[in-house]
Protein backbone atom coordinates (compact mmCIF):
# COMPACT_ATOMS: atom_id res chain seq x y z
CA UNK A 1 0.00 0.00 0.00
CA UNK A 2 2.87 2.33 0.77
CA UNK A 3 4.46 1.76 -2.64
CA UNK A 4 1.20 2.33 -4.53
CA UNK A 5 0.56 5.46 -2.50
CA UNK A 6 4.00 6.88 -3.21
CA UNK A 7 4.01 6.17 -6.96
CA UNK A 8 1.64 9.05 -7.88
CA UNK A 9 3.59 11.43 -5.64
CA UNK A 10 6.85 10.55 -7.38
CA UNK A 11 5.68 10.10 -10.97
CA UNK A 12 2.93 12.73 -11.36
CA UNK A 13 4.19 16.26 -11.85
CA UNK A 14 2.22 19.48 -11.48
CA UNK A 15 1.63 21.89 -14.31
CA UNK A 16 4.20 24.66 -14.65
CA UNK A 17 1.50 27.36 -14.47
CA UNK A 18 0.85 26.55 -10.82
CA UNK A 19 4.43 27.45 -9.92
CA UNK A 20 4.17 30.91 -11.48
CA UNK A 21 0.79 31.69 -9.92
CA UNK A 22 1.09 34.46 -7.31
CA UNK A 23 0.36 33.46 -3.74
CA UNK A 24 -3.02 34.39 -2.32
CA UNK A 25 -3.39 35.43 1.31
CA UNK A 26 -5.25 32.95 3.49
CA UNK A 27 -7.95 35.32 4.82
CA UNK A 28 -8.59 36.72 1.34
CA UNK A 29 -8.90 33.18 -0.04
CA UNK A 30 -11.38 32.21 2.70
CA UNK A 31 -13.49 35.32 2.04
CA UNK A 32 -13.63 34.71 -1.69
CA UNK A 33 -14.48 31.05 -1.13
CA UNK A 34 -17.31 31.89 1.26
CA UNK A 35 -18.63 34.53 -1.16
CA UNK A 36 -19.01 31.89 -3.89
CA UNK A 37 -22.81 31.40 -3.89
CA UNK A 38 -22.97 27.94 -5.53
CA UNK A 39 -20.35 26.66 -3.09
CA UNK A 40 -22.20 28.11 -0.09
CA UNK A 41 -25.51 26.61 -1.25
CA UNK A 42 -23.93 23.19 -1.84
CA UNK A 43 -22.12 23.34 1.49
CA UNK A 44 -25.28 24.30 3.40
CA UNK A 45 -27.12 21.40 1.79
CA UNK A 46 -24.26 19.11 2.78
CA UNK A 47 -24.31 20.45 6.37
CA UNK A 48 -28.05 19.89 6.76
CA UNK A 49 -27.83 16.32 5.48
CA UNK A 50 -24.79 15.52 7.61
CA UNK A 51 -26.17 16.93 10.84
CA UNK A 52 -29.54 15.27 10.26
CA UNK A 53 -27.93 11.93 9.53
CA UNK A 54 -25.43 12.00 12.39
CA UNK A 55 -28.05 13.06 14.94
CA UNK A 56 -30.55 10.36 13.93
CA UNK A 57 -28.24 7.42 13.12
CA UNK A 58 -27.05 6.67 16.67
CA UNK A 59 -30.65 6.52 17.86
CA UNK A 60 -31.53 3.81 15.34
CA UNK A 61 -29.94 1.00 17.37
CA UNK A 62 -31.86 1.99 20.50
CA UNK A 63 -35.13 2.22 18.58
CA UNK A 64 -34.53 -1.20 17.04
CA UNK A 65 -33.66 -2.83 20.37
CA UNK A 66 -36.18 -1.22 22.71
CA UNK A 67 -39.12 -0.55 20.39
CA UNK A 68 -38.99 -2.93 17.45
CA UNK A 69 -37.37 -5.92 19.23
CA UNK A 70 -39.14 -5.05 22.52
CA UNK A 71 -35.94 -5.19 24.57
CA UNK A 72 -34.36 -8.26 22.92
CA UNK A 73 -30.82 -6.97 22.45
CA UNK A 74 -29.60 -9.81 20.23
CA UNK A 75 -32.56 -9.57 17.84
CA UNK A 76 -32.34 -5.76 17.75
CA UNK A 77 -28.61 -5.98 17.05
CA UNK A 78 -29.31 -8.53 14.29
CA UNK A 79 -31.79 -6.15 12.66
CA UNK A 80 -29.31 -3.29 12.95
CA UNK A 81 -26.52 -5.44 11.52
CA UNK A 82 -28.61 -6.60 8.58
CA UNK A 83 -29.67 -3.04 7.87
CA UNK A 84 -26.06 -1.84 8.01
CA UNK A 85 -24.99 -4.73 5.78
CA UNK A 86 -27.70 -3.83 3.26
CA UNK A 87 -26.61 -0.19 3.45
CA UNK A 88 -23.00 -1.12 2.62
CA UNK A 89 -23.89 -3.58 -0.14
CA UNK A 90 -26.26 -1.10 -1.79
CA UNK A 91 -23.58 1.61 -1.71
CA UNK A 92 -21.08 -0.67 -3.43
CA UNK A 93 -23.58 -1.82 -6.05
CA UNK A 94 -25.05 1.62 -6.75
CA UNK A 95 -21.85 3.68 -6.87
CA UNK A 96 -21.28 3.30 -10.60
CA UNK A 97 -24.94 3.76 -11.65
CA UNK A 98 -25.17 6.88 -9.47
CA UNK A 99 -22.11 8.39 -11.11
CA UNK A 100 -23.51 7.54 -14.56
CA UNK A 101 -26.86 9.12 -13.69
CA UNK A 102 -25.02 12.21 -12.48
CA UNK A 103 -23.35 12.53 -15.87
CA UNK A 104 -26.53 11.80 -17.82
CA UNK A 105 -29.18 13.75 -15.88
CA UNK A 106 -26.96 16.36 -14.28
CA UNK A 107 -25.33 16.21 -10.86
CA UNK A 108 -27.68 18.77 -9.34
CA UNK A 109 -30.79 16.85 -10.41
CA UNK A 110 -29.44 13.52 -9.14
CA UNK A 111 -28.36 15.15 -5.86
CA UNK A 112 -31.86 16.59 -5.34
CA UNK A 113 -33.40 13.23 -6.20
CA UNK A 114 -31.05 11.51 -3.74
CA UNK A 115 -32.00 13.90 -0.94
CA UNK A 116 -35.69 13.26 -1.62
CA UNK A 117 -35.10 9.49 -1.61
CA UNK A 118 -33.12 9.72 1.64
CA UNK A 119 -35.85 11.80 3.29
CA UNK A 120 -38.47 9.29 2.15
CA UNK A 121 -36.39 6.49 3.72
CA UNK A 122 -36.37 8.37 7.02
CA UNK A 123 -40.12 8.95 6.73
CA UNK A 124 -40.69 5.26 5.99
CA UNK A 125 -38.90 4.35 9.19
CA UNK A 126 -41.75 5.95 11.15
CA UNK A 127 -44.10 3.34 9.70
CA UNK A 128 -41.81 0.35 9.24
CA UNK A 129 -40.18 0.34 12.69
CA UNK A 130 -42.99 -1.63 14.28
CA UNK A 131 -42.88 -4.49 16.81
CA UNK A 132 -45.66 -6.28 14.91
CA UNK A 133 -43.47 -6.77 11.81
CA UNK A 134 -39.86 -6.31 12.96
CA UNK A 135 -38.28 -7.46 9.68
CA UNK A 136 -39.77 -4.44 7.91
CA UNK A 137 -37.28 -2.28 9.82
CA UNK A 138 -34.55 -3.42 7.41
CA UNK A 139 -36.22 -1.74 4.41
CA UNK A 140 -35.54 1.97 5.19
CA UNK A 141 -31.75 1.65 5.48
CA UNK A 142 -31.06 0.64 1.85
CA UNK A 143 -33.42 3.42 0.74
CA UNK A 144 -31.53 5.93 2.88
CA UNK A 145 -28.34 4.52 1.37
CA UNK A 146 -29.30 5.76 -2.09
CA UNK A 147 -29.63 9.34 -0.87
CA UNK A 148 -26.51 9.14 1.24
CA UNK A 149 -24.56 7.80 -1.73
CA UNK A 150 -25.78 10.65 -3.93
CA UNK A 151 -24.73 13.21 -1.33
CA UNK A 152 -21.26 11.82 -0.68
CA UNK A 153 -20.47 10.84 -4.26
CA UNK A 154 -21.79 13.88 -6.08
CA UNK A 155 -20.78 16.49 -3.50
CA UNK A 156 -17.09 16.05 -4.28
CA UNK A 157 -17.71 16.14 -8.01
CA UNK A 158 -19.81 19.28 -7.67
CA UNK A 159 -17.11 21.00 -5.59
CA UNK A 160 -14.64 20.19 -8.38
CA UNK A 161 -17.02 21.79 -10.90
CA UNK A 162 -17.32 24.86 -8.67
CA UNK A 163 -13.50 25.06 -8.56
CA UNK A 164 -13.42 25.06 -12.36
CA UNK A 165 -16.02 27.85 -12.53
CA UNK A 166 -14.10 29.81 -9.89
CA UNK A 167 -10.90 29.46 -11.92
CA UNK A 168 -12.64 30.84 -15.00
CA UNK A 169 -13.96 33.82 -13.01
CA UNK A 170 -10.92 34.61 -10.86
CA UNK A 171 -8.02 33.26 -12.90
CA UNK A 172 -6.68 31.36 -9.87
CA UNK A 173 -6.75 27.63 -9.29
CA UNK A 174 -7.88 27.40 -5.66
CA UNK A 175 -9.12 23.86 -5.18
CA UNK A 176 -7.00 23.58 -2.03
CA UNK A 177 -8.98 26.22 -0.16
CA UNK A 178 -12.28 24.75 -1.38
CA UNK A 179 -11.18 21.31 -0.14
CA UNK A 180 -10.04 22.79 3.18
CA UNK A 181 -13.35 24.58 3.75
CA UNK A 182 -15.29 21.46 2.74
CA UNK A 183 -13.36 19.25 5.17
CA UNK A 184 -13.64 21.84 7.95
CA UNK A 185 -17.40 21.96 7.44
CA UNK A 186 -17.60 18.15 7.32
CA UNK A 187 -15.68 17.70 10.58
CA UNK A 188 -17.49 20.58 12.29
CA UNK A 189 -20.85 19.07 11.35
CA UNK A 190 -19.86 15.72 12.82
CA UNK A 191 -18.59 17.40 15.99
CA UNK A 192 -21.73 19.52 16.28
CA UNK A 193 -24.03 16.53 15.94
CA UNK A 194 -22.09 14.36 18.42
PLM feature segments, named:
Residues 1-194:
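Membrane-embedded alpha-helical bundles of multi-pass transporters/translocases
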Amino acid sequence: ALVTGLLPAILCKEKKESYTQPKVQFIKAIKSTISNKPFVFLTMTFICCLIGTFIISPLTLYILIYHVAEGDKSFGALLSGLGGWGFSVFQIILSRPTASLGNRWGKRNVLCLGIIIMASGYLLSWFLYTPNYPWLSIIPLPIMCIGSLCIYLLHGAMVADICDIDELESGFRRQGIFAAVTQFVYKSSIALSS
